[in-house]
Amino acid sequence: MLEKLMEEGMNIARLNFSHGTYEYHSKTIQNLRLAIHNYSKKIGYMYPLAIALDTKGPEIRTGVLDGGLTEVELIMGNTVTLTIDPKYAENVTAQMIYVDYPNIVNVMKKGDRVYVDDGLMSLLVQNTTHSTLECTIENGGKLGSHKGINLPGVPVDLPAVSEKDKSDLVFGVEQNVDMVFASFIRNGDALREIRDILGEQGKHILVISKIECQQGLKNLDEIIDASDGIMAARGDMGIEIPVHKVFVAQKIIFSHCTKAGKPSICATQMLESMTYKPRPTRAEVTDVGNAVLDGADCVMLSGESAKGAYPLECVRTMANTCLEAEAAIWQRQLFDDLRYNTPCPVDPSHSIAIAAVEASLKSRAVAIIVITTSGRSAHLISRYKPRCPILAVTRRPVVARQLNLWRSVIPIQYIMPPAQDWMKDMDARVQFAITYGKGMGFIKPGSALIAVSGWKEGAGCTNTLRVLYASPHEIY
């Protein structure tokens, strides 16, 4: 199944650490790497699938259902008790629900609302004691284990990084994950704490901040500056702020990321109906397409592929919709706007990135080939949203995997050892990208190409741009 998902277009695998044990996640990572190995052998080149660790974050969640049940029903109008007593942590019933936030009994008062499971169920607080909240069920539903709880408008004093998060981050470093999706980020200080925990051994790991609360939106620019990327996590966001404002918040997040040159991810309920049905609603397909038009670099599936009955169909539908949406963007106007708003002066690599996109538009190039070590040149070119794919050739596996976050970038891991003649080695890597593009079908003999690289060995920056034309035969 994992190999089939990669074939359909999956390029980042997200592990949700709100659920599962370390043994479970370790086994999943082993399975992913085995699938990557097998799929790479099948297609004849290294498939750079990235692995992301999604932290639980400073969330509030319910306990485990009693007796191994998968769900219990909360009936509208009934009374239910929320308790902080640990003895109910694994004995949750429809009448008594454990909550893992001890201070909830102090911050809540009569008349406040508690939202459960992304707002599917709502409870109205009637009375508080030193260890419980007596509530009336306003909107019922089926409750499972470890479901999220939101307290909109109520200031909570949760730590930026919980003890579980710290342990999970250390586990992620040991497992050599490529990126961390940090939940419920409220300010830039949380990012600095996460990087301290990752330490020297995990300094290569990208930290993507999930914006899902009012404080996160208020401090958006501060968080963008401190992050490697941003995720618009619309599930909790739609509870923390009025649901009719979520689409505006999404557009603000993506536009700020585009301006800052940071990758952005759109997540939550994108193809929710496909969890149980083989075809999406028209509104869901429109949502995916509009996320791309809004400027998102990535779109993400969660429950649809994690527990759904049609994971392959979900990935296929999402990939096809993204292709259609990308073709509908007015690339020239977008590029001109982005270039106009770039402050001057910029460094040589940045100048070359702008020139490469301009040259690709003027020459009608079918691809921009970037020879990169750190991936920064590909990031910069992606920032200006070219009309053609960016083939980023690198020898570093972690760079290839992480480049999946950036829009238009197709990472290619080059595994051949360096040639003694640096210029021949450079040309061989460019030819490798051309051969890849021919195999994918978007490079034809005679196609115009833009090649971006350094001008000599050890240059340390990208400062050379060439316009090439694909040969009908392979040179190397």
Which ranges hold each PLM region?
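Non-catalytic helical/linker scaffolds that mediate oligomerization, partner binding
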Residues: M1-Y476
